[in-house]
Swiss-Prot record:
Entry protein name: Putative alpha-ketoglutarate-dependent sulfonate dioxygenase
Binding site for Fe cation: 204, 206, 353
Functional description taken from the UniProt entry: Acts as an alpha-ketoglutarate-dependent dioxygenase active on sulfonates.
Organism for this UniProt entry: Schizosaccharomyces pombe (strain 972 / ATCC 24843)
Recorded GO MF terms: 2-oxoglutarate-dependent dioxygenase activity; metal ion binding; sulfonate dioxygenase activity
Keyword Iron: yes
Superkingdom in the source lineage: Eukaryota
Entry keyword annotation includes Metal-binding: yes
Length: 391
């Protein structure tokens, strides 16, 4: 078991009143530049094995054991994993899940809900099953003020199936939390200029390039900025339904190639250890959800590359159109404003998401756990969500 050692920097007293925004000088050539460390007291240097790194957190930071690292582990591709969707066991009226809810706040008509009064660590199996179905219908659900340890958060994610381990993104150093993906940034973090200049590229469904992309996904906020750092979600159900009938029919016969190679190479160029290279797989453009039976547009701009079987120019034109199409679905887009100890649960198969990249140099720290879902499929007998809602 690795141990953590830390030292705290000492600063000159006359510089102690610098704010984070004063400390952040400028953004230049994609790098978020910072002043000399001697001006600051509010950071800790943490050692993970032979690697030492600065973090803009206090010396007694509660979540030091889940700060981001790239340990020298090696992951291997596995065969197809069994997946039984817990939503298939759920009461479709959500009689167990909603009985203790004190307030239901829908963020949009068909996407996004905030549930108040529930503690995720107290859910029984019937409630967990209904949560799987609830996010299969609502896309993303937010739970504020969760009194939940990291171990309890991990147990919740593990309930839904084999927990995904990311091959290249940061994870905790300790193997006990190897299933967590760590999302962390602060004033020491590189700033990707593409986040401002090429926003469509940042919409994505997590690990859509894998043979079995993530299904039920849980994201826990540990430290949140005062402003910014929100997450936006778009409904794949709504994206499909907003297409013209001829285009729907055309797309239902096509697949699209998703690739994680570029993500792996980005980490490698950044000097970070890659545990498993991103895979490449073709998935249906129109996907059927196994619980709801609803059709969803399964496009992930961060990872989709081309449509096989048609000319590349035609493929590029179709994908460019679909990217613009989903980005313009303002009525089917919601924003999650993170609060400390809040948890978001979403169905990664039927929403895409992106961060807003507007919080730096403030610290943003979250951890994610997700179940690996089924191999994506299209069922010609599936139907649109709106058909059920009209009944």
């Amino acid at each position: 078991m690795a141990t953590l050692t830390e030292t705290i920097s000492k600063a000159d007293k006359h510089d102690e009143k610098l704010t984070d925004f004063q400390y952040s000088k400028k953004i230049f050539n994609g790098v978020h530049e910072v002043e000399d460390d001697k001006q600051r007291t509010d950071f800790t240097t943490v050692r993970f094995g032979d690697v030492e790194k600065k973090f803009a957190v206090p010396k007694d930071y509660k979540y030091k054991n889940v700060l981001p690292t790239f340990p020298n582990a090696v992951y291997n591709l596995t065969g197809e994993l069994a997946f039984e969707d817990k939503g298939l066991l759920a009461d479709p009226k959500f009689s167990n899940l909603l009985k203790d809810v004190t307030k239901v706040e829908h963020l949009a008509r068909d996407l996004g809900t905030v549930l108040y009064g529930i503690q995720l660590s107290k859910l029984n199996d019937a409630q967990k099953n209904e949560l799987a179905r609830y996010i299969a219908e609502r896309g993303v659900v937010y739970f504020p003020d969760q009194e939940q340890t990291l171990e309890e958060f991990q147990e919740l994610g593990q309930y839904y199936g084999h927990s995904h381990k990311h091959g290249s993104n940061s994870r905790p150093f300790e193997d006990k939390f190897a299933e967590f993906q760590v999302v962390y940034s602060d004033r020491f973090s590189p700033y990707d200029q593409h986040a401002k200049n090429n926003s469509l590229r940042y919409w994505h469904s997590d690990v859509s390039f894998e043979k079995q992309p993530s299904a039920q996904t849980f994201f826990k906020a540990l430290t949140v900025p005062e402003q910014g750092g929100d997450t936006l979600f778009i409904s794949g159900y709504a994206a499909y339904e907003a297409l013209s009938t001829p285009l729907k029919k055309y797309l239902e016969g096509l697949t699209v190639v998703h690739s994680g190679k570029e993500q792996s190479e980005y980490h490698r160029r950044s000097g970070q250890h890659v545990r498993l290279d991103g895979d490449t797989n073709a998935h249906p453009i129109v996907r059927t959800h196994p619980v709801t039976g609803w059709k969803s547009l399964f496009i992930s701009p961060g990872f989709t590359r081309y449509i096989p079987g048609i000319p590349r120019g035609e493929s590029d034109a179709i994908l460019d159109y679909l990217y613009q199409h989903i980005a313009n679905l303002s009525q089917s887009t919601v924003r999650i404003k993170w609060t400390s100890n809040g948890v978001a649960a979403w169905d990664n198969r039927i929403v895409i998401h992106r961060a807003t990249y507007d919080h730096l140099p403030q610290t943003r720290h979250l951890v994610r756990i997700a179940a690996q879902g089924e191999v994506p499929f299209f069922d010609a007998n599936s139907h649109e969500r709106s058909e059920d809602l009209r009944e």
